[in-house]
Amino acid sequence: MEINSFSFVLEPSYKKDGSLHSWEILTKNIFKKNANDYQANEMPFSFDALNEKEIIDAFNKQLLTIEKLEGFHLKFPLLSLNVDSLISDYILTDKYVSEHIKRKNNIALEINENFHEFKSLNCMSDLKKLSRLGPLWLDDFGGGLTSLKVIELFKFECVK
């Protein structure tokens, strides 16, 4: 089913001193076209309900939302985008998207706790490539595949 619109929110993250550290852009709702059943548009949103194309579409809409926010000339600190293995592959294989992110100085990529490279802990080549585009943060440390070994092997700029 085709997606009609998205609803995003900005969730603040604060430093120890109480000052604003960053904003995380989160997808709160997705409204599908021609959906007339309760589950399609009225249930609480979950990325698990989306297929790969829809997940990539949501990510692209997040990038466009950041562009719109920049048009208001607000003084935003970093804005973080959640990145799982699918989105990582998309970023690294789409030259336009990777260059777009690299040109921005206000986007951090927040790596999902179940990221595929955390399984083997070898060379972490995808993380190295992503780090050339901007700051990398580790999301939900302690959950999923994250461990002390992960943060020993790769220097994240922020661990949440």
Report each predicted region and the residues it spans:
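Bacterial c-di-GMP phosphodiesterase EAL domain
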Residues: 1-102
